[in-house]
Design a protein with these regions (language model features):
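ABC transporter nucleotide-binding domain
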Residues: 170-266
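ABC transporter nucleotide-binding domains
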Residues: 2-6, 11-209
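Short beta->alpha junction loops/turns
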Residues: 67, 103, 233, 268, ...
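Residues at or immediately flanking beta-strands
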Residues: 59, 225, 285-288
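A generic structural signal for secondary-structure junctions
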Residues: 79, 101, 105, 218-222, ...
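C-terminal coupling/interaction segments
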Residues: 268-311
Length: 311
């Protein structure tokens, strides 16, 4: 049985349709990422899954149950960690954990949870004295206290330093390793590639692509990217998309307004000399040139025309 089944989901506000008939499923034990620019509909979708919003149309099932029929049982089997969870600052870490334990018929011991999130030494510290990373780990511990089957994480590492981010990644992977299902939204492509078994890219209320990060990257038709920019006056040298797509081993070209460009290529050793020769023939000097492996970010920009962190 899938942990999550979504069929024909729609959500409208007055004349605006935020979610436009999306359908997807999430397997038990899977980390599933919802990616999309601001306003794409991903937050609305997640809030419907969490039982915060009611859909305008469509069906949502979690663990074979629906919010309309089984709200009390579902509340006991999901955990939710928001991007910024407000916790009482004048309570200690242990007091907050015991407060959240009181909400569930079954719960994990405080000492065990604090060990999992590496906060044992902060047990008696006030919440108001914790760092940003420590607060976020505490929020996830609160989400895990009721032994959930599904964990919802809304941009869990936004604003955290790299070390805190990786500590949270380890938490997610341990939860998945124990059989839990995770629904994740994030603005960090590295995070999605590291954690997610599958992702769905949402834009304008519709899922425009779904699959594993590796599958989506392969869908570009090439595994490498050449990024370059032309110097000042050379930026208007007349290099058009058709010129770049005609280069050997080039499968895609993205031109930016500032003269920068990214090419997806199957064989950099063939494409690079041809690109340099093209620029030289047009009298265009390269200000920057680099090659790298294609990433999920390249997939996202190709599909939406925007970077994930764009507003």
């Amino acid at each position: 049985m899938n942990a999550v089944e979504v069929t024909g989901l729609r959500k409208s506000y007055d004349d605006a349709e935020a979610v436009r008939g999306i359908t997807f499923s999430i397997a038990a034990g899977e980390v599933f990422g919802l990616l999309g620019p601001n306003g794409a509909g991903k937050t609305t979708t997640v809030e419907i899954l969490e039982g915060i919003l009611e859909p305008s149309a469509g069906e949502v099932e979690l663990l074979g149950m629906s919010w309309a029929r089984d709200e009390v049982r579902l509340r006991e089997r999901i955990g939710v960690a928001l991007q910024e969870t407000r916790l009482p600052e004048r309570l200690t870490v242990a007091e907050v954990m015991n407060l959240f334990r009181s909400f569930y018929p079954r719960s994990r011991p405080v000492a065990e949870l604090l060990a999992d999130v590496e906060l044992t030494e902060k047990r008696d510290a006030w919440v108001g004295k914790l760092s940003g990373g420590q607060r976020q780990r505490l929020a996830i511990a609160c989400a895990l206290v009721g032994e959930p089957d599904i964990l919802f994480l809304d941009e869990p590492t936004t604003g955290l330093d790299p070390q805190s981010r990786r500590q949270l990644w380890d938490l997610v992977l341990r939860f998945r390793g124990a059989g839990g299902t995770v629904v994740l939204t994030t603005h960090y492509m590295e995070e999605a590639e590291r954690l997610c078994d599958r992702v769905a890219i949402i834009d304008h209320g519709r899922i425009i692509k779904e699959g594993s990060p590796a599958e989506l990257i392969r869908g570009l038709g090439a595994q490498h990217v050449i990024e370059f920019a032309l110097e000042g006056a050379a930026a208007g040298a007349g290099l058009g998309e058709s010129d770049l797509l005609a280069l050997p081993a080039v499968t895609g070209a993205r031109l930016a307004g500032d003269g920068a460009c990214a090419l997806t290529v199957s064989e950099p050793a063939r494409a690079l000399p041809a690109l340099i020769a093209l620029c030289s023939g047009r009298g265009a000097a390269l200000a920057r040139l680099e090659t790298r492996h294609a990433t999920l970010e390249d997939v996202f920009v190709t599909l939406t025309g925007r970077h994930l962190r764009d507003g």
